[in-house]
Amino acid sequence: MFLAQEIIRKKRDGQALSDEEIRFFINGIRDNTISEGQIAALAMTIFFHDMSMPERVSLTMAMRDSGTVLDWKSLNLNGPIVDKHSTGGVGDVTSLMLGPMVAACGGYVPMISGRGLGHTGGTLDKLEAIPGFDIFPDDNRFREIIKDVGVAIIGQTSSLAPADKRFYATRDITATVDSIPLITASILAKKLAEGLDALVMDVKVGSGAFMPTYELSAALAEAIVGVANGAGVRTTALLTDMNQVLASSAGNAVEVREAVQFLTGEYRNPRLFDVTMALCVEMLISGKLAADDAEARAKLQAVLDNGKAAEVFGRMVAAQKGPSDFVENYANYLPTAMLSKAVYADTEGFISAMDTRALGMAVVSMGGGRRQASDTIDYSVGFTEMARLGDRVDGQRPLAVIHAKDENSWQEAAKAVKAAIKLDDKAPEITPTVYRRITE
């Protein structure tokens, strides 16, 4: 039997906690036998004293085990259970293509996603732009869709990693969110509860990233790879660029439209293609569906070219109560904004920098995201035809097309876009889409 205050004291004094002590504390968070004050105190001691790798693994596994851990053995699936997690960005619609692409190559992708957070868009919010789409199927239906279609994208239920929800809520109001061991455990507790064989992490770098510097993004990626492999799940991470909007669009319905166009081959933004392919390659190799990069890319290109990936996406939408002909007729189903017109720069020049975070917040301000949990989302608003770093803009080439609910909202968004995009006389050096691959 342990005492919560003694566990806090031990960590306060810089000592390592045992697996048993960590499990006792996390179970107490779940059972409400540990107070909010005690959670806050432990979080702050971890913030200042960090955690060793064994402590990080114990914390993550205890949080995972605080609720249901999915088990797929009874389904006798003929492929690996694989998933991807992104630290979030703007125009990051990779999940909508990646899940169907990997499923079309023989993987099973039980993706449990989140809503928008701060300036970053949420996969669930995007999918809810599709009429009827059900992000909370019951457990049996979720399993059926995975078995029949190969991919489902759903919201987190209260039975998955419940200790994390309470722990995070306390961190949020006690200035202890940005602690690498706590971020790592929070991300992985939910992902490892999916019962995965393999995981790839997409850790963003740059002006629209969650972590403020390249060094901190790399440290987070290394921590996640170390802990997840320590917990028995084959995991790699990619550091990818978020110094500009990843897709050509940012919003909800506009990103779903771009995802369908990507899958059908109607339009593929080159940077979005690079990042999506790189993540899919990691999933195929870690899931043992391909031996190397070349084989993985060939398989992925084939399912794009022969329409199989688009077909899987359509089947997933139908299985989750969306329209059965969504891929063919997406334009008839997705909401459109009242006002859509281009915004132009006040001067000519090359785009040399982009405040991606500010562009994400502009989408939120238009109604495309939430400032508080009770807010309703306007799925139709956002940006399309986003200019990219290095593009030359003038009176002919706009910075973006803004989709807004009215003229006032359009004007505010136009101001935000102009302020977020910096022009120069000469073209900048273009940053890579993938900076680094991190393995155990």
UniProtKB/Swiss-Prot annotation:
One of its GO terms (biological process) is thymidine metabolic process. SMART domains: PYNP_C. It holds the Pfam family PYNP_C. InterPro entries: Glycosyl_Trfase_fam3 (IPR000312), Glycosyl_Trfase_fam3_N_dom (IPR017459), Glycosyl_Trfase_fam3_N_dom_sf (IPR036320), Nuc_phospho_transferase (IPR035902), PYNP-like_C_sf (IPR036566), PYNP_C (IPR013102), Pyrmidine_PPas_bac/euk (IPR018090), Pyrmidine_PPase_CS (IPR017872). GO terms for cellular component: cytosol. Its EC number is 2.4.2.4. Homodimer. This is Thymidine phosphorylase. The lineage of its organism: Bacteria, Pseudomonadati, Pseudomonadota, Gammaproteobacteria, Enterobacterales.
